[in-house]
């Protein structure tokens, strides 16, 4: 049985959507460095729901090079839950912020990160696990420049709160239109939409749809992709928050919104940012898209060629 006392807390390294994250040493495993995530429960008095424990237990089986490993679950008493993850000290948001403005991530780097991101998602989707809250902050990068997905499956176990632990509003910038329009049925397409938004952001060095409210987010999407209708998105009229009175915008070419991306990249992005979730490209199909044909993910030199190394980012999360 794993006990909280097996872990020696070093420092607080961040506050995520679900609670505080500490850097800690695992005394039972040669003092390996881990991330100790204390989950804040919505109703402290009711304890940890058994459904959440079941969901999280399944995540321990998710072993993939592009997914942050969940080592252990500590249910210290009926009201507290800690998740023990492998420790990675940099996320994609901080990494992008560290590169001087005017300097791109580099086409090879973007392709490498996209390949790794989609591989991780394919693995999760093949196990019927959705993320539902993908964003640059929960894409972590190791010292070799490999990208790994964090917080997969937590949305199903705990729900996606409206406000993060720090009371800041959870970002809407990567949220799929079917969720924004009040849809209650999600599919793997919600994650592929988020991947498209992250793809565009890596190319542009700024978010594609930086809305500050749900309606602002919806209208920012419409201004670029056009206002959807029944023809391009069957049954959109039945979504609770869709209004026939929405302004009618025409679709713009994505090459105008993401000018640095080549034709194959634009085609892939176009297939990710499809309104109808059933027609959105899957992770499996995305990996065989021509955009990746000239990608050699084994070439780790790309990481240093295109970019600043990450040694200087130690102790960040």
UniProtKB/Swiss-Prot annotation:
Q: Where is the active site?
A: 133
Q: How is it modified after translation?
A: Phosphorylated at Tyr-18 by SWE1 in a cell cycle-dependent manner. Yeast-form and hyphal cells display similar dynamics of phosphorylation and dephosphorylation of Tyr-18. Tyr-18 phosphorylation leads to inhibition of CDC28 kinase activity.
Which residue ranges does the record annotate as region Disordered? 296-317
User: What Gene3D superfamilies does this protein map onto?
Assistant: Phosphorylase Kinase, domain 1 (3.30.200.20), Transferase(Phosphotransferase) domain 1 (1.10.510.10)
Q: Which residues carry this modification: Phosphothreonine?
A: 17, 166
Tell me what turns on expression of this protein: Expression is increased during exponential growth and repressed by the antifungal drug plagiochin E (PLE).
Quote the Pfam families the UniProt record gives. Pkinase (PF00069)
This entry carries the following GO cellular component terms, namely: cellular bud neck; cyclin-dependent protein kinase holoenzyme complex; cytoplasm; endoplasmic reticulum; nucleus
The chain positions of domain Protein kinase read: 7-292
Broad class of enzyme this protein falls into: transferase
Source superkingdom = Eukaryota
Locate the Phosphotyrosine modifications and list their residues. Answer: 18
Spell out the reaction equation it catalyses: L-seryl-[protein] + ATP = O-phospho-L-seryl-[protein] + ADP + H(+); L-threonyl-[protein] + ATP = O-phospho-L-threonyl-[protein] + ADP + H(+)
User: Is this entry keyworded Kinase?
Assistant: yes
Q: Which SMART domains match?
A: S_TKc
InterPro entries named among the record's database cross-references = CDK (IPR050108), Kinase-like_dom_sf (IPR011009), Prot_kinase_dom (IPR000719), Protein_kinase_ATP_BS (IPR017441), Ser/Thr_kinase_AS (IPR008271)
Keyword set, alphabetical order = ATP-binding, Cell cycle, Cell division, Kinase, Mitosis, Nucleotide-binding, Phosphoprotein, Serine/threonine-protein kinase, Transferase
Which GO annotations describe the biological process of this protein?
A: 7-methylguanosine mRNA capping; cell division; double-strand break repair via nonhomologous end joining; G1/S transition of mitotic cell cycle; G2/M transition of mitotic cell cycle; hyphal growth; meiotic DNA double-strand break processing; mitotic sister chromatid biorientation
One of the record's GO molecular function terms: ATP binding
Stated EC number for the protein is 2.7.11.22
Functionally, this protein is described as follows: Cyclin-dependent kinase that acts as a master regulator of the mitotic and meiotic cell cycles. May drive the G1-S transition. Plays a role in mitotic exit. Plays a role in the expression of morphology-related transcription factors, and especially hyphae-specific genes. Binds distinct cyclin subunits as cells progress through the division cycle or flamentous growth. The CDC28-CLB2 complex regulates cytokinesis partly by phosphorylating the actomyosin ring component IQG1. The CDC28-CLN3 complex phosphorylates SLA1 which regulates cortical actin patch dynamics.
| Family of this protein | Belongs to the protein kinase superfamily. CMGC Ser/Thr protein kinase family. CDC2/CDKX subfamily.
Could you give the subunit structure recorded for this chain?
Forms several complexes with cyclins CCN1, CLB2, CLN3, and HGC1. The CDC28-CCN1 complex associates with septin CDC11 upon hyphal induction. Interacts with IQG1, RFA2, and HSP90.
- Record's protein name: Cyclin-dependent kinase 1
Annotated organism of origin: Candida albicans (strain SC5314 / ATCC MYA-2876)
